[in-house]
Amino acid sequence: MVQILRDMDEFKTFLKAAGHKLVVVEFSAKWCGPCQSIYPIYHAMSLQYQNVFFANVDVDVSPALAESCNVKAIPTFQMFKKNQKVTLFSRIERIICCYRSGFKVKQIYEFCGADAKKLEEKIKQLM
């Protein structure tokens, strides 16, 4: 099941309730075509991976929450464990990635776009 989050208090409570389990948060909007196309798949994943906590934040309903999570595009998927954003790369991979990009890489723990395959791969990798 996908939990709808409306504000920072709900967000923090949700992360705390997840404990050590993976949390996947989708930031989306009702008017966004790619968001509409990925949502049924995202919902199905929430039923398939019951040991993962899934949430949705509508950026139009909760702009302050989206801003505090530094969301710049939609859909954006952010992943958390133990109340922290998950880093998807090892430390050495981050250093190499940052070096190659001229140290302009800031967000390596999330991705944007309606790529269901990529989303599922990351969930499996982090479970």
Tell me what each language-model feature is.
Residues 4, 23-26, 53-56, 76-80, ...:
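Beta-strand cores of modular interaction/reader domains in eukaryotic scaffold and signaling proteins
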Residues 32-35, 77:
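The canonical Cys-X-X-Cys-His
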Residues 10, 37, 41, 118-121:
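Acidic, Ser/Thr-rich intrinsically disordered and amphipathic helical segments
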Residues 14, 41-48, 65-68, 110, ...:
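Alpha-helical recognition domains of nuclear gene-regulatory proteins
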Residues 73, 79-127:
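Non-catalytic, surface beta->alpha helical segment in thiol-disulfide oxidoreductase systems
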Residues 4-22, 63:
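A short beta-strand-turn-helix
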Residues 26-32:
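Aromatic-flanked redox-active Cys/Sec active sites in thiol-based oxidoreductases
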Residues 5-6, 27, 39-64, 71:
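Thiol-based oxidoreductase modules, predominantly thioredoxin-like and allied folds used
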